[in-house]
Amino acid sequence: MAAVRSGLVDIFVQGQWHRVLATLDPTAITLQTMEQNEAEAEKRTVRVVKYDGNGLGISIKGGRDNNMPIVISKIFKGMAADQAGELFLDDVIISVNGENLLDASHEEAVRALKRAGRVVDLQVQYRREDMMHRENIVENVEWDDDIRERVRTIGLKLAYVARAGIDADAEGRILEMRSPSGRYSLAMRCSSSEEADGWFEALHACTTCLLTQALAQVNIMLGNNPQVRHMGWIAEQVSENGISMWKPKFMTLTNSEILFYEAVPQLKAEWAEPRLVRPLVATRVVQTSSRTAPVIKGLTDVISFRMRTGTQQGVRTHTIRVETHAELARWVRAVVIGGYEACLSTSQVSAPCLWRGESCELIVNLDNGISLLSSTGEVLWQHSFETIRATGDDGGRFLWVDFGPPHGEQELDLLNSAKPVVFILHSFLATKVYRLGLYA
């Protein structure tokens, strides 16, 4: 299968970054350590910029007096060398700002590093002993298939691909992949933000294409009961211990519901046990990111939409982050159109209530409007949607509907939260407009 993209990247395994060769094809990404002769021959120049009077943030060992090359023995977290992100333990330092250190003593190397100035260009090279260790690193990459081989192939179907958050990746060079089960993840670091953009776009495009096949397989397994109309990984904004964060979720849309899972369900029984269910008829999209808004990294570059659902516990809000504007458009359209079609399929809902102290039943019908039945089934009143002037609720049990003169405002005690009826009423009104072909 033809490669979509190939190149050197760093992967985070066992607490350290390791350089590997990554090759992407339409269904999988393959990771392998570089051939020893290639890796040993690869010399690279890393620019480190010191700040606020701090040093490079490395310790070295070796030198002519020890019959060793000058080797990085420690990289101090948070300091300049660590922030550069391209230096590794046991890298051999060949030169500092053009000054050759291949034959330097330890003391000469220390002096060269100290007088290097604020901007330091280090030419470095992987060490032979380090490469012997690196050859097996991809065998330690964990994924759902639990296959450990010298060349690691990771399937992309139903994998989650996302950009790392601003807190973890100020330079925009890190991508994150999560396995379908949600148990394993892999961080991949590129040489620049532009390189990361290219890798992300290629990976995301592959996973998106594979969703079509996965969706068909899911519906075959479920026997279209329910029929899954749309599905995929998203990140939901949650609060844990007072801290707001984005948590990966697997979200699906059926003919009537939005289902949230912690990961991709593997068995039919798992599909029947979502973490959370929201009815489409009582859900609406209330806010989306704008393509034209100015982009401020870490603030307005998050692509998201917000849904609100009327429930017996009141209004529940879900803020959903996706990775591309195309993905945003697909999700928003799926939720909005799915809501209309769910209303068309449902066509009528009813709820027990009190009206003027009497037990009644409120009927909301897509074609006939709103009606109220007595406990004996007598129609107490009935009004079309067109006669509604205004609606309101107290955030609790009470709903007000103003039909204008001569009938005026009617107050209903819905015994539980009025929000489901309020949301469904508005969904029915929007569906009538959609049915007229006025939805763009």
Curated annotation (Swiss-Prot):
Pfam families: PDZ, PH, PH_17, Syntrophin_4th. It comes from the Eukaryota. Keywords: Cytoplasm, Cytoskeleton, Membrane, Repeat. The lineage of its organism: Eukaryota, Metazoa, Ecdysozoa, Nematoda, Chromadorea. GO terms for molecular function: acetylcholine transmembrane transporter activity; calcium channel regulator activity; structural molecule activity. Component of the dystrophin glycoprotein complex (DGC). Interacts with dyb-1, dys-1 and snf-6 to form the DGC. PANTHER family: IP02644P, SYNTROPHIN. Adapter protein that binds to and probably organizes the subcellular localization of a variety of membrane proteins. May link various receptors to the actin cytoskeleton and the dystrophin glycoprotein complex (DGC). May also act by slowing calcium channel activity via a direct or indirect mechanism potentially involving other second messengers. Plays an early role in the formation of the neuromuscular junction and is necessary for muscle maintenance. It is found in: Membrane; Cytoplasm, Cytoskeleton. GO terms for cellular component: cytoplasm; cytoskeleton; dystrophin-associated glycoprotein complex. Residues 2-208, 227-340 form the PH domain. Residues 45-128 form the PDZ domain. InterPro entries: PDZ, PDZ_sf, PH-like_dom_sf, PH_domain, PHsplit_syntrophin, Syntrophin, Syntrophin_4th. Expressed in neurons and muscles; particularly strong expression in the body wall, head and vulval muscles, and in ventral nerve cord (at protein level). Residues 384-440 form the SU domain. The gene is stn-1. Its main location: membrane. One of its GO terms (biological process) is regulation of forward locomotion. Belongs to the syntrophin family. Transmembrane segments: none annotated. It is a peripheral membrane protein. This is Syntrophin-1. Signal peptide: none annotated.
